[in-house]
């Protein structure tokens, strides 16, 4: 077999194996998934039986990790959405925002027909308006901040221990 054929076969093997390697979630993606799962599992909705439907905007860097089946089951039903129109008809109990601005997050909440919504943002570092929970991602470390005003208006109940955890992580 000629060298060029061997090189070609090696290249084919490498390229076909690349998608398998690329699908392995990174540590930060796993940490985001664990954080979101934890927040959802300590949240209660009035008049909801069964797992909540979490709509994940496709702009999220971690949309794949938040929806894929892993060794642990998810405490929510993930639905990927692309537009505000999809969000309005999705029947979600919560939203996970990617690049959507805090203003967009507020406007969607005001227009959405549901009274009880859990809102988690990936790119809302100030956490002053918009979502109730804002992820703070630095390298592989994932923490969160809580917007108590947004949470009090959300219609969902969150275990107070989660709020204390956010406070401890932000203080230390």
Swiss-Prot record:
Provide the Gene Ontology terms for cellular component. Answer: periplasmic space
Regulation of this protein's activity per its record: Inactivated by reductive stress.
- Signal peptide residues are 1-22
Q: What is its main location?
A: periplasm
Q: Keyword Signal on this protein?
A: yes
A single GO BP annotation from the record? bacterial-type flagellum-dependent swarming motility
* Compartment(s) of residence: Periplasm
What is the role of this chain? Repressor of the cell division arrest function of DgcN. Prevents DgcN relocation to the midcell.
Q: Could you tell me what this protein is called?
A: Protein YfiR
User: What is the species listed in this Swiss-Prot or TrEMBL entry?
Assistant: Escherichia coli (strain K12)
């Amino acid at each position: 077999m000629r060298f060029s054929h061997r090189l070609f076969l090696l290249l084919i093997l490498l390229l076909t194996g690349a998608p398998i390697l690329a699908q392995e979630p990174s540590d930060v993606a796993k940490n985001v998934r664990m954080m979101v799962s934890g927040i959802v599992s300590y949240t209660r909705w009035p008049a909801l039986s069964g797992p909540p439907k979490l709509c994940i905007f496709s702009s999220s860097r971690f949309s794949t990790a938040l929806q894929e089946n892993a060794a642990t089951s998810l405490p929510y039903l993930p639905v990927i959405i692309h537009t505000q129109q999809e969000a309005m008809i999705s029947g979600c109990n919560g939203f996970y925002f990617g690049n959507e601005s805090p203003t967009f997050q507020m406007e969607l909440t005001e227009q959405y027909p549901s009274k009880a919504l859990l809102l988690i943002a990936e790119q809302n570092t100030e956490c002053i308006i918009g979502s109730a929970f804002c992820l703070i991602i630095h390298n592989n470390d994932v923490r969160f901040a809580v917007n108590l005003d947004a949470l009090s208006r959300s219609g969902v109940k969150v275990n107070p221990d989660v709020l204390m955890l956010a406070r401890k992580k932000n203080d230390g």
